[in-house]
Amino acid sequence: MTTTLTTDLNADAGESFGHWPLGDDARLFPLLTSVNLALGFHAGDPVTLHSAVRLARQHGLGIGAHPGYPDLVGFGRRELALTPLEIQAATLYQIGALQAFLTVEGGTLQHVKAHGALYMRIHEDRAAGEAFCHAVQQLVPQAYLIVLAGAAGSDLALTAAAHGLRVRREAFPERAYTGDGRLASRQLPGSSIHDPAEAARRAVGMAQGWVQTLGGERLALEMDTLCIHGDNPQAVAIAGAIRAALAENGVTLARLHD
């Protein structure tokens, strides 16, 4: 019997701000199955968010909220000393903004995924993770919560489950992994991958259940969705290469599902 492999392909997007464009959503969205939309705190603005919701709906994408720290200058990738209460409120506020546009456009929220430094913090800081999960459970309990694939996501997955949330695991074909299955620091040489062919090769491996680490080892990695970063200058080329490579290796792309 042949086993059919299926995965979701998502990207962080909707990140333009006013007169300053970032990424190429018009060319990227047709290549995806899901999208994580910036909500104005780390990137994006109301007009960009509304336009991104419309574009995602046109292409039948699963739409996800991508809340981050209130840090436009640092693109949400710097740690901020927000309290758990502030994290909960900021998460509710940002998801609420997306919910408004989804209501207007007749869409539904598929998932929630934290951005940047907040994403890392809720995986490592239990109180922060509790606050984030509580906000999601309060407002959109039907949405999937995205966590890191591998050991790095295990604690947050347990916290999410305790709040009655459904978890989906995410892997990054254009990011390097350490020997313990965690994302390599962006400060390390080779931590970010810009070659579409290499990202595609890694995506196929991830769909098959493994990832090659910085040290060259092959590590088991179970995941449900692949993520690329829309601010990567090669994002469109990477997404296209991944789609082609997955198809060539018998992997079907589909939105997140039970």
From Swiss-Prot:
Q: Does the keyword Hydrolase apply?
A: yes
Question: Which transformation does this protein catalyse, written as a reaction?
Answer: 5-oxo-L-proline + ATP + 2 H2O = L-glutamate + ADP + phosphate + H(+)
Cited Gene3D superfamilies: Glycoside hydrolase/deacetylase
* SUPFAM superfamilies according to UniProt: Glycoside hydrolase/deacetylase (SSF88713)
Any one GO MF term held by the record is: ATP binding
Does the keyword Flavoprotein feature in the UniProt annotation?
Answer: no
E.C. designation(s): 3.5.2.9
Name one process (GO BP) from the record: carbohydrate metabolic process
Enzymatic class:
hydrolase
Keyword terms of this UniProt record = ATP-binding, Hydrolase, Nucleotide-binding
Which segments does the entry list as coiled coil? Answer: none
| NCBIfam families cross-referenced by the UniProt entry | PRK05406.1-3, PRK05406.1-5
Q: How does it assemble?
A: Forms a complex composed of PxpA, PxpB and PxpC.
The record describes the protein's role as: Catalyzes the cleavage of 5-oxoproline to form L-glutamate coupled to the hydrolysis of ATP to ADP and inorganic phosphate.
Family from the record: Belongs to the LamB/PxpA family.
Task: Give the protein name, as stated in the record.
Answer: 5-oxoprolinase subunit A
